[in-house]
Amino acid sequence: METVRSENTKAKIKASMAETHARRKSQICRVFELKVSIRHNPKSVFDKLSNCFREAKWIINDMLSLSKDNSDNSIFDYKYTDHKNVVHFDKDKNPVTSTITLPSVLHRATVAQKKTDIVNLSKAKAKGIKVGALKFKSEVNCIPIITGFTKILDASHITIPGFRKLKVNGLHQIEFEEYEIADAKLVRKASGYYVKLTIMLPKTPRTPTYRSGGLDFGIKNTITTSDNKTYDCKVQETEYLKYLSKMLNRHKTEKDSKRRWNCRKQLAREHEHVANIRKDIRNKIYHDLVSSYDVIYMQDEQIKNWHQTWFGKQVQHSCMGALKQKIKMLVKSDRAFVLSKWLPTTKMCPVCGTVNAIGLDERTYQCDCGYSKPRDWHSACNVLLFGTTKRAECVEHASAEVASSMPSGSTGFAQAAPLKRNLEAHRL
């Protein structure tokens, strides 16, 4: 039976949401990953966690099976209270009916998340983005938790729906006097089970450095700054990873064997280990750049196209693409400026302005005017030069447009929002 909310309840919800939105303006979002301790939790806890993800898969597949043609019309009528018994298939593809024992909070959140995903797919399809048909899930590795049902008990224990006291590692990261848990997710990885917490912290004023820097992406030196500081973000495959890949290839004919399953599990765990190292290096480089410069300039290099070249393997083993995307997110806050990739940052001399041809094997830029500098450092300095010039032109052009649109007799630039929109529109 559908619950009908009274007008008083709707007004309370609306007022609470408005209060939350006002509070979020003075807060900053941080995500912390807590690992469920393997040594200090009984085996029954992990059996229950495994069962939660198994039943979450059954619930999602039950939602998708409501319509034979996989249309999403009847999925929105799905009520978790009316589907306590679901039909799934065993390894021999025989239908089996099972009763859902998943905690109601996780059950409701799984259903709501799937409906939200379908709405987002519909919006993407309306924008012209190609989306495929809805397909059944072979596994589910993330279960959302409704806000308000996750609490930190002490320095090493938390409580989530279905688990009154869960021993986790990583709570030492949350050592703040004021914080608010906004969201939580239960995640399964190759290395174990995790609880990801989205924490809202009070904003602290940032001390400006009054410095700008240009970045140059390359192969030998992955990142070079205009201050001649280099970063290496390449992480090669480990020998153990290569060994496991060979072992998995040997057992490719034994598709259902336990030996192949164990090898796949070890290989996934090693891939996650290498990915974590790459992610750690990316975050450290990003933090160093953001804390050193107020504005970062870089070219819009197509890192994806570099994968098709003879040095593509080195690019794939680095985190250049992820780091570039993370820096581009600073464009909205005017802390990053992206230049066109066609600007001659490597060929142009910053002293006389001459454009000289230079080969890939030449590591030092030399001009007839006597200017000489290492290739990557020279490119980063030119990126900074082009960036400051183009940014000044964009600000001047956008300011002129805003001034022409203002009524006569008005003073100052009170229309700050149109100025910012015009600045973003005139970026290269």
State the predicted function of each range.
Residues 68, 123-127, 334-336:
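Surface-exposed helix-capping loop/turn segments at secondary-structure junctions
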Residues 78-189, 317:
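Acidic carboxylate diad motif detector
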Residues 3-7, 30-33, 40, 191-428:
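Positively charged, helix-rich recognition surfaces that bind polyanionic ligands
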Residues 60-63, 109-122, 377-387:
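Stable alpha-helical structural segments in soluble proteins, enriched in small hydrophobic residues
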Residues 2-108:
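Gly/serine-rich nucleotide phosphate-binding loop at the start of the catalytic core
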Residues 33-35, 165, 183, 212:
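Well-ordered beta-strand positions in beta-sheet-rich domains
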